[in-house]
Amino acid sequence: MICIPVIDENVCDAINSAKEALKYGDIVEFRVDLLKDVTFEDIEEFSKVPSIITIRAEWEGGNWKKSDNERIELLKHAIKNNAKFVDIELKEERNLELVKYRNESNSNTKIIISYHDFEKTPEIDELIEVVEKELKIGDIAKFATFAHSKEDTLKILNLMNKYAGKIIAIGMGESGKLTRILGLDFGSILTFASMEGKASAPGQVDVKKLKEILKLIG
């Protein structure tokens, strides 16, 4: 799957952007933390679209400035409304609460447990430890780390291959672009690509360019 982030500040703009993005991608990621104001009704609308609902905490590089309690309640509402995926951080102390809520409400939502390092790509043993912890909590493990070299890129591709079908792995930055292009072939559930001028992370490839490259490499 190709996932396109929706990074608008206005809810109506976000819904329109999602409709446009789905002409090119398979799924969108609503970055709810970037919206100026969001209601439970908005979450219901987002959940009708093939999407990942992400409300990234400020301490994990996001923009959510309201209470953690409100964030968790919005994510629960997405689960209640059967959003395709919700994303919650490995470092969030209440992530198991969301999994329990999903299980008790018989929701079809898959829970992504995520980890970010915006400075480096840790050693492979440390990354394996992260992924194993994530898979003990949620359905899908996700990590996004900053790649500085070919070695970093190879580490990330190696882990995609090891955990194929239950991982989303990303190398941020220019050196990590190859992880975005080859990710699907190496076992990542999805890869992120952006609409023109709307990247949500360093090194994100324009979706039209990505599709051209994927077509070329077969």
UniProtKB/Swiss-Prot annotation:
Pfam families: DHquinase_I (PF01487). It catalyses: 3-dehydroquinate = 3-dehydroshikimate + H2O. GO terms for molecular function: 3-dehydroquinate dehydratase activity. 3-dehydroquinate binds at E29, F30, R31, R56, R180, S200, Q204. The keyword Amino-acid biosynthesis applies. Keywords: Amino-acid biosynthesis, Aromatic amino acid biosynthesis, Lyase, Schiff base. This is 3-dehydroquinate dehydratase. It comes from Methanococcus maripaludis (strain C7 / ATCC BAA-1331). The gene is aroD.
